[in-house]
């Protein structure tokens, strides 16, 4: 879900409602769930704010989104730091590592807030807690990628891909297509 929302957040500058419509339209291609829609709208708003509003505080935004979904991420992060606790104390005890949206998306927001300035540490921490880490990682990567920019992604993660040259061409073509649309 995150790539179309991120792209629409960029293309729909200043129009959160348009971004939300795109997010819900995409979600409804495969799911009809008010719970999923609630979470999709939080992601949509978060990405929109990161992409369109200068100086946004990603940890604060992520904690706010988590709070709206019923998870006190700011308080949990504070407790984890005070007690030198592990991410396993959060994902596995407070939140399930499974794919259920009411557990997995707050987990993503927890990681986005806790590791807001370190893309690599965030993705590694997510991976280490196990469970549905691939899907969480995709969304976490989109949040931190939007916040920190492409330079925050370790170069070895990009150039070390088996089909790096082919993927690089596809990405450049994709970006060029949307750059053309933005230029008129």
Question: What annotation goes with each model-predicted range?
Answer:
Residues 134:
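Conserved catalytic/binding loops enriched for acidic/polar residues
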Residues 1-115, 123-129, 143:
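Amphipathic alpha-helical interface segments
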Residues 6, 137-148:
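Short, small-residue alpha-helix embedded
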């Amino acid at each position: 879900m995150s790539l179309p929302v991120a792209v629409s957040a960029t293309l729909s500058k200043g129009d959160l409602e348009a971004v939300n419509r795109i997010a819900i339209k995409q979600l409804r291609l495969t799911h009809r769930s008010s719970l999923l829609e609630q979470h999709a709208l939080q992601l949509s708003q978060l990405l929109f704010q990161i992409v369109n509003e200068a100086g946004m505080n990603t940890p604060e935004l992520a904690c706010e989104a988590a709070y709206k979904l019923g998870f006190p991420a700011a308080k949990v992060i504070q407790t984890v730091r005070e007690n030198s606790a592990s991410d396993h104390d959060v994902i596995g005890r407070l939140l399930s590592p499974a794919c259920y949206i009411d557990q997995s998306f707050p987990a993503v927001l927890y990681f986005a807030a806790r590791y807001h300035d370190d893309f690599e540490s965030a993705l590694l921490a997510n991976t280490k807690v196990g469970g549905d880490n691939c899907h969480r990682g995709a969304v976490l990567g989109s949040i931190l990628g939007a916040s920190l920019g492409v330079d925050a992604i370790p170069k070895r993660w990009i150039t070390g891909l088996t089909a790096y040259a082919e993927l690089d061409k596809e990405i450049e073509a994709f970006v060029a297509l949307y750059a053309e649309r933005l230029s008129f």
